[in-house]
Amino acid sequence: MKRKLTAKEYTYVASMLFGLFFGAGNLIFPVHLGQMAGSNVWQAILGLLITGVGLPLLGVAALGISRSNGLFDLSSKVNRPYAMFFTCALYLTIGPFFAIPRCATTSFTVGLEQVLPQNGSNTLYLLLFSAAFFAAALFFALRPGKILTWVGKILNPCFLVFLGILVVVALLSPSAAIADVEPLGDYASQPFFAGFLEGYNTMDALASLAFGIIVVQVIRDLGVDDPAAVAGSTVRAGIFSSLLMAFIYIAVTIAGTQSRGVLEASENGGTALAQIAQHYLGSAGLFILAATVTLACLKTAVGLITSCAETFSALFPDGPKYRIWAIIFSLVSLLFANLGLSAIISYSLPVLMFLYPLSIALIALALLGKFFGHDRTVYCWTIGFTLIAAVYDLIIALPESVFNAIHGPAIKAFGQQYLPFADLGLGWICPTLIGAAIGLILHFMRGNRAKA
């Protein structure tokens, strides 16, 4: 008889999944989406929920159903060099290049920046704040102890309670009717796809491939061995966490939209969140928000530094040890953090436009692999075609100066002429399907059932 999780065990796994993906930094994207989407907010929310909630859940399920022992093992189904490249690229993205620096800049933007005089000294204040932030993060990454358990078990629930109070107050005292708020930017013409791409910024689908094995291993440790049962248990346990995440995203997004009655659309969601807290709850509300966000982001940064250092010390056993990697990643994160929150979000976009198609394709292949025996041929053709299209998406999302320097306008015109959905930022879909079709045809023609 197949072992099944009890209700208590489902609750435990669900709380783990929620803790894995939910971070204070994630809130800056739905609130910004809400301000930008205006009256088109519901279409935008749907797109956000697909990439910000649905894909992470599928990513964890993919690790379970494919019997993979982590990201490197899963991507090795293409080949080992690709696995090394993809694993390093993904961990650097959710690590020292973007996600870890974002922890510091989000804390600074939501908190200290709001009370500083606007006299041009913010660059110095950000440097001092981020230096202290990463000194603390490195300290705890090298000496994990009970403080992190306290932060996780006590602070996160307190943060959710405060967030709940803020959202309830904002929703019960709307500053504007949703129908009266004018959509801005791409949200005026294609809100669903703009929301879909905004979900990339959460990086949760990437995180699901990197850290999902932790949840899968917990389910296995609870006695569930059958791959289908592991995946099923992951999905069922994830329903609760996904619904909670979706509820938070929707509530915060609507609060962002309604705030447009008294606030202009902010440059980034960190500023918007702070302004909303100050408007509805005053200076005390802003202080509480800043304190809880800072500590929650610190916990996230410690976890990411630890995971990245462990991964790189395992990938390069003859290279630096864990302690050295942790120091390197902390210093690199400090450097990138001082670009500022808006710059980090802007510079991360091309990388996310490159990594997300590859991640989505890998998740789909892992989930559907039983239908073609996880044949390496299918993996190689699918990822190969996706890789080409992902490079195109990366080029299109580059900063304007770089984009123009590499003849970006000509490349963009070519793609929009020959790649369906390229103008929506989804030009990778058709190449991915073509690559998968070629791989499947070759697989079934040769009767090749070789396992990757």
Question: Where are the regions a protein language model picked out?
Answer:
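Hydrophobic, membrane-embedded alpha-helices of multi-pass small-molecule transporters
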Residues: 11-22, 92, 169-176, 185-252, ...
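Selective recognition of specific alpha-helical transmembrane segments in multi-pass small-molecule
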Residues: 54, 58, 158-171, 234-260, ...
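Membrane-water interface regions at transmembrane-helix termini and the short interhelical loops
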Residues: 65-69, 73, 132-155, 221-224, ...
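TM-loop-TM module centered on a large, flexible mid-protein loop between adjacent transmembrane helices
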Residues: 70-76, 248-298, 305, 314, ...
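Hydrophobic alpha-helical segments and their helix-loop junctions in multi-pass secondary transporters
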Residues: 96, 100, 160-187, 205-206, ...
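Membrane-interface loop-to-helix entry segments
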Residues: 141-170, 349-360, 379-389
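Hydrophobic, small-residue-rich membrane helices and short re-entrant helix-turn-helix hairpins
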Residues: 143-154, 192-195, 215-244, 262-274, ...
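A generic transmembrane alpha-helix motif of multi-pass inner-membrane proteins
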Residues: 173, 184, 375-452
